[in-house]
Amino acid sequence: MYISDRLKQKDNETFSFEIEKDRDFRILQLTDLHMGFGFLSRKKDRLAMTAIRTLIEETRPHMIVLTGDSTFPFLPKAGTLNNRRQAIKLMEFLDDFEIPYTLVFGNHDCEMGCVCSKRELAELYKKGKYCIFTEGREDLTGVGNFIIELTADSGEVLMPMVMLDSNMYGEGGWF
């Protein structure tokens, strides 16, 4: 979990992240990376990582937000079902930038037959050196439903960021 004087966890579903009120706060939002970290996805993973590195260098964000499908443990595409390894590799990659990041799960982060459940992945992501993540409330569908309040040093909430798990496939299968 990201540790900073600027970040406080208020409860199991709310963080407070202090930003400078009179300065633009840049968020780099990335979605559907589908990082496989398997033998079938090596080339695509390298291309994606190069693109992400370039985006970070050019935008110099204060926070990175991953909005689902960051990994893709699908055997025909990645060559692996090991989403635990994928999550660890993704965290290692992002932690190297030393920029706080947060994420939500999409429908591909835990494909059928994969190694870890969302709850198990949540425990992993909470260990990321720069990751801001919590499971959120138990009475809401999904894992990782939480709020990051971007606040001024006075405590005034300048902008709430609501992070929601988009969940998996509907009842009855994939479609």
Question: Where on the chain are the PLM-derived regions?
Answer:
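N-terminal active-site segment of His-dependent metallophosphoesterases
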Residues: 1-84, 89
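Extended active-site neighborhood of metal-dependent phosphoesterases/phosphodiesterases
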Residues: 2-19, 85-175
